[in-house]
Swiss-Prot record:
It catalyses: L-homoserine + ATP = O-phospho-L-homoserine + ADP + H(+). InterPro entries: GHMP_kinase_C_dom, GHMP_kinase_C_sf, GHMP_kinase_N_dom, GHMP_knse_ATP-bd_CS, Homoserine_kinase, Ribosomal_Su5_D2-typ_SF, Ribsml_uS5_D2-typ_fold_subgr. This is Homoserine kinase. The gene is thrB. PROSITE patterns: GHMP_KINASES_ATP. Keywords: Amino-acid biosynthesis, ATP-binding, Cytoplasm, Kinase, Nucleotide-binding, Threonine biosynthesis, Transferase. Catalyzes the ATP-dependent phosphorylation of L-homoserine to L-homoserine phosphate. Belongs to the GHMP kinase family. Homoserine kinase subfamily. It comes from Petrotoga mobilis (strain DSM 10674 / SJ95). ATP binds at residues 86-96. Pathway: Amino-acid biosynthesis; L-threonine biosynthesis; L-threonine from L-aspartate: step 4/5. Disulfide bonds: none annotated.
């Protein structure tokens, strides 16, 4: 049996629309083995309303993409999915399925494709690199999907940096979130974001966290999506008052992320108490950065072959 462990991801990080992403220490596990015939997909009972267990399953679709690419098809498959990444919450659940499915398929066939080839397949399936890249390689990534390849850079983040995830109890699809965006943006808004992307990346990598309250600002996507996030203004205002260094909408939402530097317990507890007074359910959790990305797990533990 082949096992892969795929991290959650948070994308955009404010101004880095469709290009920046960070891997998080929250994981899905995918287990696959070849069987004599058919397709068997096993998922937890609580996920059965949201995840298909037939050929439309996204993990299987990713596996099939690789099988078709190399023209090798197993007789049958048993796929076990252990899902810890919340679905449709802006934490890269779809990217985890795509990345994990491609890698587990590659492993099943004794690795006919190189990592860069798999990354390209994943990015073409997802349409963007912002969640795909950190799921593969960990850390902070910036990338571009070109006609025949993906260009990217991975950067290590300071170990004291953590993310405070405020996860609503409702789904918000990427398709719906994209439908809220304008077809065109004013040049001054584009310049606003471009200037802050550079400041954001440099500040994160060099621990200049004092810049993050400004560097995470955005005029391209968050202004159009925030009205669909209950209590956005109240939550983000509270985040800054209690000591987070900056905040942003995670991916297309609805999760809101606060950036933490070091000690966080009082901030986490205060946020839980604050949110308990609203009529919208939220889960608050502190997540460490996943520095290594996806891992293939064998009987002796991780072999780390995709780092």
């Amino acid at each position: 049996m082949i096992r892969v462990k795929v991290p959650a991801t948070t994308a955009n990080i404010g101004p880095g629309f469709d290009s920046l992403g960070i891997a998080l220490q929250l994981y899905n596990i995918i287990e696959v083995e070849e069987i004599n015939f058919g397709l068997e997909i096993n998922i937890p009972v609580e996920d059965q309303a949201y995840i298909e267990t037939n050929e439309h399953n996204l993990v299987y679709q990713a596996m099939k993409r690789l099988f078709d690419a190399v023209n090798i098809h197993p007789k049958g498959l048993r796929i076990n999915l252990i899902n810890n990444i919340p679905i449709a919450r802006g934490l890269g659940s779809s990217a985890a399925c795509i990345v994990g499915g491609l890698v587990v398929a590659n492993e099943l066939l004794n690795n006919p494709l190189k990592k860069e080839e798999i990354i390209y397949l994943a990015a073409t399936m997802d349409g963007h690199t912002d969640n795909i890249l950190p799921a593969f390689v960990g850390g902070l990534t910036v990338g571009s999907l070109l006609e025949k390849e993906v260009k990217y850079v991975k950067m290590d983040l300071p170990t004291q940096l953590k993310l405070l995830a405020i996860i609503p109890d409702f789904h918000f699809s990427t398709k719906k979130a994209r439908s809220l965006l304008p077809k065109n943006v004013p040049i001054e808004d584009a310049v606003f974001n471009i200037s802050r992307v550079g400041l954001l990346v440099a500040s994160l990598v060099t621990s200049h966290f004092e810049n993050l309250s400004e560097a995470t600002k955005d005029k391209i996507h968050q202004p159009y999506r925030k009205d669909f996030i209950p209590y956005w203004e109240e939550i983000t205002s509270k985040l800054m008052k209690i000591g987070t260094k900056g905040y942003f909408l995670s991916g297309s939402g609805p999760t809101i992320m606060g950036i933490l530097d070091g000690d966080y317990k009082n901030i986490e507890d205060e946020m839980v108490n604050f949110l308990s007074h609203f009529d919208q359910g939220y889960k608050v959790t502190v997540l460490d950065v996943c520095h290594n990305g996806l891992e293939v797990i064998n009987d002796e533990g991780s072999n780390g072959c995709y780092r």
